[in-house]
Amino acid sequence: MSSSSNSDPSSSPDNTDFIPLKDNPKDTSSYINKKNPFVNDSFDSHDDSYLDNVNPFEYNVADDEDTISMTSDGVEFHNLGITETVDEQDKILSELQLAYPTVSRYSETLDKGLLNGDKTTKGDYTSLRRFRKPFLFDKLSPYFTHFFSEIYAAVLRVVGPPRANETPGRNLPFSPILRQIYNHPLYNIFIFVVIVLHAVLLMIRSDDPHDKSQTIDYLIIVIGILYTLEMLLKIYLFGFLYDGSSSFYDFINSYTKKTPRTMSYLRHSWNRVDFVAIVALWISVIGKKQQGIFRLFSMIACLRLTRLLNITRKTETILKSLKESSTPLVQVVSFNAFFGVMIAILGVQFFKASLNRQCVWLGDYGDQYLPTGQFCGGHWENGIKRAYLDKNGFPSNVNPRGFICAEKSVCRVVENPYSNTVSFDNFFNSLELIFVIMSSNGFTDIMYDIMDAEYFVSCLLFIISAYFLTLWLMSLVIAVVTSSFIDLQHSGKNQKEQKSVDKHLIRNKLCEKYLFYSNFIWISFIVAQFVTLCTQTYDQTSSTANRYLIFYACVDFLLAAEVILRFFAYLPDYRLFFRRYTNLVDIVLAVLNLVTLLPSIRKNPVAFGWLSIFAIARIYRCILLIPYTRKIAKLLFSNFKQLLNLMLFLVIVLFIASLCAVRLFQDLPNDGDSDDDAISFATTYESFLYMYQILTSENWTDVMFAIQARLAHLHLSWIPGAFFTLWFLFSNNVVLSMFIAVIQVNFAPSESDLKMEQLKMYLARLLRNYNPFQASLTLNALIKRNGSRKGKTVDESHYEWLYEDNIIKGFLRVTNIPPKEPLKPSLDTSPELSKYSLAKLSNNFKRFVMRDDPFSQAYFKRVIGIRWEKDMNLKTAAKDMQAAKAFVRIKQTEFLKNHPKYNDVFWVIKPSNRIRRFCQRLVMPGVNERYGGVEPYQWVYRVIQVFIYACILTAVIIECIATPIYERDHLLNDKQHAWFVWTEVAFATIFTIEAAIKIIADGFCITPNAYLRSTWNCIDFFVLVTLWINLYAVLTSHALLSRAFRAFKALRVLRLINLTQTSQRMFHDALISGFFKIFSAAVVSATLLIPFALWAKNVFGGLLYSCNDDNVLSASQCVLEYASTPNNWEVWAPRVWSNPPDYDFDRFPHALLALFEIASIEGWVDIMRSVMDITGFNNQPQTNASSGNAMFFVLFNLVSMIYILTLFIAIIISNYAERTGSAFFTAEQRAWLELRRKIKSMRPSKRPAIRPLGLRGLCYDFAVQKHGIWRRTFTGLYIVHLLFLLTIFYPCPIAYTYVRNSIFLILSICYTINICVKVYGLSFYYFFHSFWNMFDVVVTLGSLTCNIAILAKFENRSLTLLQTTLLVLVTVHLIPKFDNFDQLSKTVVASLPSIFSLIATWIVLYITFAIAFNQIFGLTKLGLNGGPNKNFRSIRNALVLLFTMTFGEGWNDVMHDYTISYPNCVNGDDFYNSDCGNKPWAYGLFIAWNIISMYIFVNMFITVVFDNFSYIHTKSSSFTNLQRNDFRQFKDSWAPFDPMVTGYIPKRNAVKFVLSLRGVYDFRIYRDEHTLRSIISKVQSKTGQQSVPMLENPLMGSEINLEALDQIIDTIDVNVVKERRNVLNSLCTEIMTLPGNVISFSNILMLVVLHKIVDHREAFPISDYIRRAYVLSELEKSIRMEKLLGLVETSIIRKTFLQHMEEKKKALENPFILLSEVSEILPETPIQEVLRQHNADPEQLLMSTRTPSVSDRSFSIVESTVPTIASGEGDDNHSVEDHLKVPTDNEPRRSPSLKEVLLRGSHSLHSNNDRTSFDIEAGFGTAESDFQFGGATEDINRIADRIDDYLDRDSFKG
């Protein structure tokens, strides 16, 4: 096949037909200059990372020659920087040895360079896209050429990824001509223009659907024809499903992903999208007026526009990350959907027919019928509670519950909300509401409606679902996307070359000083202007406005002059001035601010308000001046380009989604509700706003429910439900997670610094000796018998050993370390301060005013910090710590000598005072060790602490009971004898006595162990003071004083955090250690809120006023009264001209509060709709009169959502990761930690080791086979079971309910049979060892019993709910049936400890704030957002309301309800007679809870899940090849050694077990082909004896082929055998050093993995590595010593044996002794002694094992680095010092010297407990070594090395 071109392809050397491929299947790097920066040599299949290497608009003229290539005919080509990649489909062609000369897609010239390249990358073939340079470009600048290349590259990305052209197997008519058309650049440009035109036409049609709809429809049909022709052209050239390049069999196999893909049309994802869109387009054209279901196809046709997402390289990279995360994302979403389905089924059974009951007002005479919208469960009738009425008006047969309607109204069944589309009546509606819960927005209204219709406890299902589904499982979705995107960011970051930044200095020193010092002056002008803008109001007088204007003009001209002066300061290097971005920004701001002073702008308040942003933007200089904000801002904006690309991606996605929504929901019929009809998708702009609203999750359910209601009559309500749900899931959970990933990357350290950061953190832990919780013992400590903290001394030599160069080098994997490696671990969170910063000046002032206190923790930090600044390295870290402590102790002694009264309590009570010593015997010191005192009696102290804890718990319970309403009711009757008042007095007295004892024991504030030095004591003292003040106010009836201080009593609940150590640590990590970072994030957020608030005040100040009468047009008409119709009742009311009740922008504080609420993604839609209705000053708002104003809030909401919410999440994730150390873990270390967690959780198989026979053996197979027919059958039954559960609905016919219950009974019987089969096959013992089996028994028998009872007519509501719950629990068996679900479930379980500790801390805060809210607002009247259960009048209501505010659900509306004041409430003289709110307390408490719970703890929850999930999906480790089958194989090998499934085997069997392992765990020294039997069978002569002889004499009767034997021996690698023997020696020795006579399953698995698979140098964190290095060094010493002693013992035995033989010879030569008497006369030989000790013969000796006792000390990795499950999680439960401590011998023992051993022989080492047998097959020997190594270690090592060489040399001799 040939093609006509300028250069005949037949002239090529091979005279081979060329194929102009769109995807060249050969490497074309041969014709590209190697200096070309656009070439990437490591392209993967469909890898578009090369796009990151093409940096647009950074073009170097010098590189023009590298980007231009010439062909043989002189045609010039320009490099586009786009590689063409295809899969391995061309391997078939390469095997056929077909030549691949091709032409460029943009020229017919033969590219001979393709013949030279044959390099592939991972089996893929890549080339470089080029375009033919027109002749006109020679006249233009190369910059224009590069710019054109970037534009054309964008065109190619949108049109589609370049693919290969027709394959050699196709030869169709007209293909050359069509190929030329397809290869022409104008064709690509034309297709790009068509796609853009399609988007424009759709937007125009949506904005004007009536006038131009017919014309645009015709144009869209034309575009559809063009799309179809393009598709047919591709199909003709490439084939539809089969391209003909290979056999049809290979084509079928290509779908298995094991063989390369073909070039056919549908084998590429973008072509499949195009095909679906084109087919949907023609279906929508056929449909009549695009109504009904045809709307769906019209929407699908818009998917062709998704190609616009490839417009830039970065957006294409984002798509790539989404594609890479698609598989785990689908798995996680499926896992979440499974649990969502389970809860949806429960929702149907629990809450069916609950939302169709409302209170109906009947009127005074029963002649009215007005549904009130209040859900109910009964009504009052003549003072008696009655059940609700059914739809026919008859009473129901259920008990009244929930909200009881008032008199003259009834609770009656009506239609479900939103045209019967919102309910729990069937599975699909229930599943929709469950997803609403998972979205964490819009579910609280449904929850309170259910609580009104049912019982209060109904909220538990919503609370559990919200925490489990939303915070726990949905966090996995965020973790998948974030992990994938972070990995992509790191890969791109590693590929980028660091650009060198030239630091130019100003030559004139005077100018440099001027720039530095004058900066403060100019910033003061900026601050003054900013403050002035804040004080300016919209209603100021004209004279005031002129003064403000004059001031603004002066400041603007001064700052403009400052820019000019700054420019002259840079001279003569004026270019340096323009290289600084701040200078360029200041120039632009100066010019624009001068422009705003023009009269035409100044006199227009709207334009002046919008342009005031340029004056406000100068505040950035203040942000950069403060070190705190500058550091965070730099981290935040360090990846600013990536954030902009993400914003571009988000905008494009929003635009396409808006067009799709318009095509679906434009011109929908109204359902009659005016509120729902206001939601319209009539235009693209409206659709854009609604789609963005759903993205932010703010009231997104209102949009979905309203559209569903309008489509309900067409039975198409499922379309908006599915559409909006998918859009919410993609936009809110996927796209926004990418912003978190971008910001988080900025906070993460580089890969090269991770291990060094671990070292720094490790030293920081060593030096940190301050514990803020030391004042109180935890509950765990109180229940222990011995609670004294015994100091454990650590030998200094161990520290020296830890910091040896070889240890540090081994961890860092470097060969050279500087002699003094600077290491400055951070003991505090304060950043580095600049020389003239305010914080630095403040610290200096404090040091000048306050004297140094050597007893404070800050003093120790400062001392060690000075040492670090001078000279600090890894070796001297421990010595520096000890020196600093000694120095501080000396300073403390000197300080007390100089200030003898310092340790006297109140300068009176001396340390020797008896009362003080008595008090010291009762309590522990607040901080540090007690100086100059006595230690407390432990039991007395414990009793006191238990009593105090009991008092705290009792006080909390009383506070939950004695609410303000309860107190008011009792105080009105008897104020003097109210029991709760006197209990408060009693508790206050007890806590006062406790504080007094502590103060007398250790002092109040200035003594070494003062009371107020402890954080918790400060909180206790503050609570105690407020408690007495509140008691005084209550007893004296001081209302204002009582209300001001009564909330502080809730702080005592914080003492409950001390109940567990994990909650202590979690509280410390969340609120204390990360306080500074969170505060910094808050400051940075404020720098964003404040400028926007000021801008909003200038733009919208005074424009939100409106009249409550919609019929007036201006403020002048808003007078007198009008007929108001609340609840359809006409009432005359006065007209009022006012702002909205909860927000306005008239003052700066009001604007700041409004924007803070918007930043929490709450309430911004209402504010946006208000500003969209603005018509002008003093004019009545009109709907969408100023719709463009909405973009202000869209912009602010997007920026705040990205830079505030994601900033908080990223900082909290970073802080938690740094505290736990996971932030500095490498990929290998993360994988190891995950593997360690897996191993610790593994248990032996719960089944017999030997398969029974007969029928029981068959049952055994059914029980143990993972993929057998029996298991698959029951998996199918579980799926059928789940499908029948989905058929529960209301109203359901009784007959179908009976049939369904019968089916469930049959299934339960099948499950019971399955249990019986398992029990019979495994036996009771093994069956009940499994948790799943016990769970199966309980659930199956419970469901069977319930089914029988229900079918036997014993049905009631409680039994039905129990039956459904048990049936739903049966479906849990599907989780272990699928590997993905099983793995994700283990991820969830792995995070349980951290989650529970977080929840425990969270619950304490819940109770604290619930009591505070109840004490302050327990009597406040209900507002518009309140309800029967939505209030703070009881603790349970307060807890539920706090739960809703945790998810941001209407927290701002509730807050404004509790700011109510007089005259809208009753403000009585007494607290109990007032129902007003409290504005300071409302703002303080609500905002504090919003920040602590919503911003911190919710993100901590996500962080914990993310931290565990990242370990599961780590794929870059060297031991990820461990599969589930490998662990199963290990369990199978374990089973024969542990037949009773105890999880332990004796140590004497450990070596046999290790040698029995196969596969990846194989520890045999010689493999199967090199065993003795295998070698004998191969070397025996054919004429000799063919059977293998007995092992006692293997060569007897055989003829050996010595030549074959030599060949086999030559194949044995001596080094490999030596390495295997060393590994086996080390493993067995470490096993024997473990304490006890048995070893557990997890411990031996851990040791096997450590010795065989894991490289501790790469995989271990620093603490584990140090411990492991010590263990290995001790093992090496032990093994060397064993070899030495073995040699000595062998020598002695040989000498004894020779003496024995000599004596025997002499005895035989003696003629007076008979031969039979020789054995009786001669002494017993050492070998016979050994055999006698073991009661064995020589044959048994070969199989015997021994238990070497290398040392009485246990230094195994199992006991240190990897603790048992009971001990916790390594470093989390133990201090770092514990990892460094090596156990010492408790009992002294005799330690013979090496000289004694060598002179006296091995008899000096033997004892009665010595076991000297050894395993010949294992090839190692050990002996007891009870002496210290001392200084003879080097000699021993040299001797052992010689022994090794001798043994290795002799082992293979001959």
Swiss-Prot record:
SUPFAM superfamilies: Voltage-gated potassium channels. Its main location: membrane. Keywords: Calcium, Calcium channel, Calcium transport, Cell membrane, Glycoprotein, Ion channel, Ion transport, Membrane, Transmembrane, Transmembrane helix, Transport, Voltage-gated channel. It comes from the Eukaryota. The keyword Cell membrane applies. Residues 1-33, 1764-1792 are annotated as: Disordered. It is a multi-pass membrane protein. Glycans are attached at residues 40, 310, 699, 786, 1058, 1184, 1356, 1508, 1773. The chain crosses the membrane at residues 184-204, 220-240, 274-294, 328-348, 427-447, 461-481, 514-534, 549-569, 581-601, 606-626, 642-662, 723-743, 946-966, 980-1000, 1021-1041, 1075-1095, 1148-1168, 1193-1213, 1274-1294, 1302-1322, 1331-1351, 1358-1378, 1393-1413, 1486-1506. One of its GO terms (molecular function) is stretch-activated, monoatomic cation-selective, calcium channel activity. It is found in: Cell membrane. Residues 1-15 have a biased composition (Low complexity). GO terms for cellular component: voltage-gated calcium channel complex. Residues 1771-1790 have a biased composition (Basic and acidic residues). One of its GO terms (biological process) is calcium ion import across plasma membrane. Belongs to the calcium channel alpha-1 subunit (TC 1.A.1.11) family. Interacts with yam8 to form a Ca(2+) influx channel. Voltage-gated, high-affinity calcium channel that functions together with yam8 to mediate calcium entry into cells. Required during conditions of environmental stress. This is Calcium-channel protein cch1. The gene is cch1.
